[in-house]
Amino acid sequence: MKPNRKPKYLSPSALACWERDPDEYYLRYICPVRKPRDPQTDPMAVGSAFDALVKNRINVELHGYEATKATEYALCQLVADQCEGHTLPDALEIACILFEQYIECGAYRNLMDVVHLSTRDVRMEFTVTETIGGVPLLGKPDLHFNTPKNCEVICDWKVSGSVSTAGVSPQQGYARALDVHGSRTHGKAHKKFDPVDHVSGLVVNGWKMNESTDYWADQLATYAWALGHWVGCEDWVARIEQIAVRPGYRAKCVVHQSTVDCDYQHRLLDRYQECWNAVESNHIWKSLSKEESVARGDMLYTRLMMPDDLSSLSAGGDFEVNWNGL
């Protein structure tokens, strides 16, 4: 059997995968033969297309249309990079409907009013790596800028419910909701938004992000560490631009702006260290003994190498397995 692969880094999505489904984690990151990538789903494609639209718009506003055409933020380039062909043009059409509402309701301008105050260059879609507590971490922030008080804001867009027949409601604790339909929540904060003056000069929610949506907190805290903040630091701002979609592609655009609790960050690092220890010790399934864990990995690898169609195992069928690859 070929030796296992070893990932160079852990990311928030990798940690979540290992905690949720060790089998899937093994097949994605450890198995000697990489599992074929799953096709991009419709919700993922709509989110990626929206992401392309907003980042193109921001770059055009900051640097001009002609300058943007020559960069990776050209719209055609972003869409090609982020959306798989089988999802187009449908995903882009839905994303355009949502993006128009994001602009019209004022959510985009609400964000850019803060971005334009940045004391440093605004960065989007960039890779950061850092070893924290012995764990090599990797992140890819959607948007990063500074406040006039030189505090960093780490921002991510989330499109929720774009292809759901029932739609979704925004996560609790948002600072402001905006839409083009004149709903009763338009222009208002969620009841769990507890305004607190932050060292950044911005108003944040005293109800920490890890208390409302822990995966968002995991993601943005990881980015903050990789950008140089110490574990437990709350001097940076975690911002989520959420587009919650109801039936008929009616979007409610809300902004979540808060911090991630110091103790929660330390527990997050503990989780990363546990995952990295599992990788380095080749003991992926912590609920099993080391021997049972290795055996489960061998079984998954063997199953991956088997042909999809096992009908040839019936009498008279030709069946070949590349045993040298096992």
Q: What do these predicted ranges mean?
A:
Residues 49-126:
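A non-catalytic, helix-rich entry segment at domain boundaries
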Residues 64-65, 132-134, 147-151, 231-234, ...:
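Short, solvent-exposed loop/turn segments that connect beta-strands within catalytic domains
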Residues 10, 178-217, 222-326:
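Metal-dependent nuclease catalytic regions and adjoining charged, substrate-binding loops involved
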Residues 8, 12-63, 96, 124-125:
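Nuclease catalytic cores
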Residues 31, 54, 58-62, 145, ...:
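Hydrophobic/aromatic-lined pockets within catalytic cores
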Residues 126-219:
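Non-catalytic protein-protein interaction segments used by genome-maintenance enzymes to assemble
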Residues 2-7, 23-36, 77, 154, ...:
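Short amphipathic alpha-helical segments and their helix-coil junctions
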Residues 26-27, 35, 161-166, 246-250:
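Short catalytic/ligand-binding loop motif for oxyanion handling, primarily in non-cytosolic enzymes
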